[in-house]
C-alpha cells in the first residue's frame, strides 16, 4: 500500500509539526508515504489524482481503528490519498470525489490537530498490518 497525505497548509503549531514529522518518520518503516502540503483546498484533488481518496470531513463516517484497517486492506496494492482541508474545510468538489468521507471525531478539530490525529491513526493501522504490538484492541 502506498499512502499519500495531502494537507492544506504546513502545521505552524510546534506540537503538531513535530508530531506529524515523527509519525511520518515511523510510518515510512512500514509503507511508502508521501506527505504533501498545498496552499488552497482547490489544489488537493490534483495532488490525489490516480489515488483512492479519503476525505477528512466532520460529516463523514466514524470508523474504529480496526474498521479503518479493514477498509485499507480492501485497497491493498492501490495508492490511497488522505485529504485534510484547511480552517475552512473542503470545497464541495473535493467531497464529491471522495471514495470515503471519514470523520475522526464528532467534535470539530482544529485542522493541524486533525492532521496529527490522522497521522497517528495511519501509523497505528500500519503497525496493526505488520503485526507490531503498538495497537492493543
Curated annotation (Swiss-Prot):
Enzyme class: transferase
Binding site for S-adenosyl-L-methionine: 56, 85, 104-109
Reactions this protein catalyses: pseudouridine(1915) in 23S rRNA + S-adenosyl-L-methionine = N(3)-methylpseudouridine(1915) in 23S rRNA + S-adenosyl-L-homocysteine + H(+)
A single cellular component GO annotation: cytoplasm
CDD domains linked to this entry: RlmH-like (cd18081)
Enzyme Commission code: 2.1.1.177
InterPro entries per the UniProt record, alphabetical: Alpha/beta_knot_MTases, RlmH-like, tRNA_m1G_MTases_N
GO molecular function annotation: rRNA (pseudouridine-N3-)-methyltransferase activity
Function: Specifically methylates the pseudouridine at position 1915 (m3Psi1915) in 23S rRNA.
HAMAP family named among the record's database cross-references: 23SrRNA_methyltr_H (MF_00658)
Subunit structure: Homodimer.
Family that this chain belongs to: Belongs to the RNA methyltransferase RlmH family.
The protein's name in its UniProt record: Ribosomal RNA large subunit methyltransferase H
Organism: Thermus thermophilus (strain ATCC BAA-163 / DSM 7039 / HB27)
Gene behind the chain: rlmH
